[in-house]
Design a protein with these regions (language model features):
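Alpha-helical segment of the N-proximal tetratricopeptide repeat
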Residues: 2-24
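TPR/TPR-like (Sel1-like) alpha-helical repeat modules
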Residues: 51-75, 90-93
């Protein structure tokens, strides 16, 4: 399976409430690494998931992956990933503002 299919699979798992399985699918999408768009979506999902579950170190790792590539993503993908980029920046700002991360 390619990364895009793992993202689709994760979306279906989320709709069924199978969040742990969705996390596994998103991790597989990242491991495959053949699609920047799918990897960005997976990192965003995982960053948000870990943030909600108060695992701020893991959240930061995934969200910083997006933030570090923001210019490249904006140049290559136009506005396709704006939501993911905005969410990553917002959550990183929140973690910094409330001293949730070092």
């Amino acid at each position: 399976m390619n990364a895009e299919l793992y993202i689709t699979k994760a979306s279906l798992q989320i709709s069924k409430g199978e969040i742990d399985k969705a996390v596994d699918s998103m991790m597989k999408a990242i491991e495959i690494g053949n699609d920047m768009i799918s990897a960005t979506k997976a990192h965003c999902f995982l960053g948000e998931y870990y943030f909600v579950n108060q695992d701020y170190a893991s959240s930061k790792e995934h969200l910083e992956w997006i933030a570090q590539r923001q210019e490249e993503l904006e140049a290559e993908c136009d506005d396709l990933l704006n939501d993911e980029i905005d969410k990553a920046n917002l959550l990183l700002d929140m973690m910094e503002t409330f001293s949730l991360i070092e």
